[in-house]
Swiss-Prot record:
GO molecular function per UniProt: asparaginyl-tRNA synthase (glutamine-hydrolyzing) activity; ATP binding; glutaminyl-tRNA synthase (glutamine-hydrolyzing) activity
The name this protein goes by in its record: Aspartyl/glutamyl-tRNA(Asn/Gln) amidotransferase subunit C
Family named by the database record: Belongs to the GatC family.
Assembly, per entry: Heterotrimer of A, B and C subunits.
Keyword Nucleotide-binding: yes
Protein's GO biological process: glutaminyl-tRNAGln biosynthesis via transamidation; regulation of translational fidelity; translation
Purpose: Allows the formation of correctly charged Asn-tRNA(Asn) or Gln-tRNA(Gln) through the transamidation of misacylated Asp-tRNA(Asn) or Glu-tRNA(Gln) in organisms which lack either or both of asparaginyl-tRNA or glutaminyl-tRNA synthetases. The reaction takes place in the presence of glutamine and ATP through an activated phospho-Asp-tRNA(Asn) or phospho-Glu-tRNA(Gln).
Enzyme category, top tier: ligase
Source superkingdom: Bacteria
Organism: Polaromonas sp. (strain JS666 / ATCC BAA-500)
Keyword annotations of the record: ATP-binding, Ligase, Nucleotide-binding, Protein biosynthesis
Enzyme Commission number(s) of this protein: 6.3.5.-
Reactions the enzyme catalyzes: L-glutamyl-tRNA(Gln) + L-glutamine + ATP + H2O = L-glutaminyl-tRNA(Gln) + L-glutamate + ADP + phosphate + H(+); L-aspartyl-tRNA(Asn) + L-glutamine + ATP + H2O = L-asparaginyl-tRNA(Asn) + L-glutamate + ADP + phosphate + 2 H(+)
Amino acid sequence: MALTSQDIARVANLARLELRPEETEHTLSQLNGFFALVEQMAAVNTDGVEPLAHPAAVIGEVALRLRDDIASEPNQREASQVSAPAVERGLFLVPKVIE
């Protein structure tokens, strides 16, 4: 699979990116190199190769030793919000930064 400059321009347009011609060529080169590597890996014959062991498969039926989900500290939201300039229903109010 190989991309063209038109493919890069289309994807950039969909992503609302403005690429200079040299950026387009650089991106095209990088992506085509990536696709060439993927094609090389796909061409490798893996018949008879055992999959690597997965830790969960090695453990099998043994129960995982996880700690109980218990709150270790009390809720201090009110104390944290005392110095906040604006709070509403337990949430910090901040100025709008995106139009």
